[in-house]
Amino acid sequence: TVSAKEGYLVKKSNGCKYECFKLGENEHCDTECKAPNQGGSYGYCDTFECWCEGLPESTPTWPLPNKSCGKK
C-alpha cells in the first residue's frame, strides 16, 4: 500500500490556507485538491479551510516553515 498524506491545502507563495465557506462537500476544495500541482484524491471544507486527502508526500500542507500567512 502507498501511504497518502492529508492536510490543509496551503498557498506556497504566502503560507495561507485555501479558504472555503460551504462546510462539508465543497466543489472548490475538491477541485483545488485534485489540481495537477496538488495531486490529491478528495477535498472538502473543514473549519472554513480546504482539507485534502490522498496527497503525495511532495505536496506541502499547512503550516509552511517561514511563511505564516501575514501573522508574526
Curated annotation (Swiss-Prot):
Modified positions (Cysteine amide) in chain numbering: 69
Molecular-function GO terms, alphabetical: sodium channel inhibitor activity; toxin activity
A Pfam family assignment: Toxin_3
Extent of the signal sequence: 1-4
Example of a GO cellular component annotation carried by this entry: extracellular region
PROSITE patterns in the cross-refs: LCN_CSAB
Cysteine pairs bridged by disulfides in the record: 16-69, 20-45, 29-50, 33-52
Primary localisation category: secreted
The entry's keywords: Amidation, Disulfide bond, Ion channel impairing toxin, Neurotoxin, Secreted, Signal, Toxin, Voltage-gated sodium channel impairing toxin
Transmembrane segments: none
Domain topic, free-text comment: Has the structural arrangement of an alpha-helix connected to antiparallel beta-sheets by disulfide bonds (CS-alpha/beta).
Protein name according to UniProt: Toxin Cll8
Organism: Centruroides limpidus (Mexican scorpion)
